[in-house]
Curated annotation (Swiss-Prot):
Signal peptide: none
Gene3D superfamilies in the record: Carbohydrate binding type-21 domain
Protein name in the entry: Protein phosphatase 1 regulatory subunit 3C
Superkingdom classification of source: Eukaryota
PROSITE patterns found in the cross-reference section: CBM21
Biological processes, Gene Ontology terms: cellular response to hypoxia; glycogen biosynthetic process; glycogen metabolic process; regulation of glycogen biosynthetic process
Motif extent (PP1-binding motif): 72-75
Function summary: Acts as a glycogen-targeting subunit for PP1 and regulates its activity. Activates glycogen synthase, reduces glycogen phosphorylase activity and limits glycogen breakdown.
Keyword Cytoplasm carried by entry: no
Any GO MF annotation of the entry: protein phosphatase 1 binding
């Protein structure tokens, strides 16, 4: 397909032919020098700004650090206040404070003693089943099992199913019965149990501030049909003793059951007494 194309030709002017050999080239050399020394035309796209922008990114204006405020020391007397505070104690106050301190010393000594752990001072009632069953039929309530882990006392209680409405509580003391608490027990649905008995459970947290010399004891009460039945371990209550007291009790039992050991102690005491008397009287010649 033929296409018409227009081509624009730019032809520089040449010197006329009649001047080719007659005129000199001085004018043309001057014209060329002027064209070389002229500055080129400025392009439409300004690349200078983009180049500077990429090389020199904007930066925050630097500020000189502000000078820190100087610390000043001001005394109270410069503001009209007193430099000292005077407190006068009367002799009565001193005596009272001394007596209070002396009164608190025994409690402080007890508090500074290391905390002693406690253990159960009774056997598990259910281990002797015949005796346990006998006490249950007699008192209508009996402690079945009990464990002590740290400061948590847990256990189960068996009661006779006399009536539908019943209440089982554990009465416990932490200060030798000066005060006591009644803990309500929870009914356990024992599927494999007997129909004539019910099972209850309890959980008691023992305070960590209980003094070693204070006894921790508890007993069980069972209320049904307007009557209250008690299980107090045959009048001795269920006690929790410290390990130190337990060692003392075992030592006493060992001395009673071991007469040979007691005889050795007597012989040692007699020998010590004889040597002491010989030293006082002097040597015998």
């Amino acid at each position: 397909m033929p296409v018409d194309m227009a081509v624009q030709l730019y032809i520089t002017s040449s010197p006329p032919l009649h001047h080719r050999f007659l005129s000199s080239y001085k004018d043309y050399r001057v014209r060329n020098l002027i064209s070389v020394n002229c500055k080129p035309l400025r392009p439409c796209i300004n690349t200078k700004n983009t180049h500077n922008t990429s090389l020199n990114p904007p930066c925050s204006v630097w500020k000189a650090p502000e000078p820190k405020a100087k610390k000043k020391v001001v005394f109270a007397d410069s503001k009209g206040m007193s430099l000292t505070a005077v407190r006068v104690f009367s002799p009565c106050e001193n005596k009272k404070s001394d007596s209070q301190v002396q009164f608190q010393l025994p409690k402080l000594e007890v508090a500074l003693k290391p905390v002693q752990s406690r253990i159960l001072a009774f056997r598990q009632p259910a281990t002797e089943y015949m005796e346990f069953r006998k006490r249950l039929m007699k008192n209508s309530v009996c402690l079945e099992s009990c464990t002590l882990q740290g400061h948590t006392l847990t256990g189960t209680i068996k009661v006779r199913n006399v009536s539908f409405e019943k209440s089982v509580q554990v009465r416990i003391t932490f200060d030798s019965w000066e005060n006591h608490r009644d803990i309500e027990c929870t009914f356990l649905n024992d599927v494999c149990g007997c129909r004539d008995t019910d099972t209850f459970s309890f959980i008691i947290e023992i305070p960590a501030c209980v003094l070693p010399q204070d006894s921790v004891e508890f007993c069980v009460s069972y209320t049904c049909g307007g009557k209250t039945h008690w299980d107090n371990n045959n009048g001795k209550n269920y006690a929790l003793v410290t390990t130190h007291d337990e060692k003392k009790d075992k030592t006493k039992e060992t001395d009673l059951l071991d007469p040979f050991r007691n005889q050795q102690k007597r012989n040692r005491f007699t020998a010590d007494w004889n040597s002491l008397m010989i030293g006082i009287r002097g040597p015998t010649w």
